[in-house]
């Protein structure tokens, strides 16, 4: 069995660790590629931007997922994490209730506007690539059964494995891990 001995630990009160250490880099990427600006330009759901813009809500939800969050309520864990907030350069982020209210404002046109902001940014990133970037493309397609308990989910049915769910198909550029629209 395990018999660790002679181990000593030191720590400092100034040590600040973050399990999702790359979240600051992800936010810098969103800024550098123009995604933040594109989200604010295309998605218009808020009458006032006090204190949050549309990009703050969209990216807050995305960052929650990147940090292992599985539901909007997990945003509260991020809100209480001082190191997470510092990594993003934020004093505060929208709470889960506000994020839910934001999501409920979307209609079909708003979803298309959100997708337009993402696509505009994707095209800008692709155009910045050198010519050899486009020498080879491998397209990958895969599907999965997504379990749901929603009673009104369009296309929901009982799957081969006995789960109630739906079957999205994801097509991506395998060499670049980029989703094809």
Question: Predicted segment positions?
Answer:
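Dynamic "connector" segments at or just before major functional cores
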Residues: 1-181
């Amino acid at each position: 069995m395990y018999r660790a001995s002679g181990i000593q630990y030191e720590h400092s009160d100034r040590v600040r660790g973050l399990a999702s250490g790359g979240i600051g880099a992800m936010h810098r990427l969103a800024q550098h590629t123009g995604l933040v600006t594109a989200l604010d330009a295309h998605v218009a759901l808020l009458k006032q931007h006090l204190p949050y813009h549309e990009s703050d809500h969209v990216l807050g939800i995305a960052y929650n997922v990147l940090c292992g969050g599985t539901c909007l309520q997990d945003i509260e864990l991020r809100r209480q994490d001082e190191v997470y907030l510092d990594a993003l350069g934020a004093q505060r982020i929208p709470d889960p209730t506000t994020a839910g209210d934001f999501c409920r404002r979307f209609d079909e046109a708003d979803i298309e506007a959100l997708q337009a902001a993402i696509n505009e940014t994707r095209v800008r990133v692709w155009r910045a690539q050198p010519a050899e970037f486009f020498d080879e493309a491998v397209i990958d397609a895969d599907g999965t059964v997504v379990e749901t308990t929603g009673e009104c989910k369009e296309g929901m049915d009982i799957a081969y494995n006995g789960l109630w769910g739906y079957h999205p198909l994801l097509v991506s550029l395998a060499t670049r891990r980029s989703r094809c629209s």
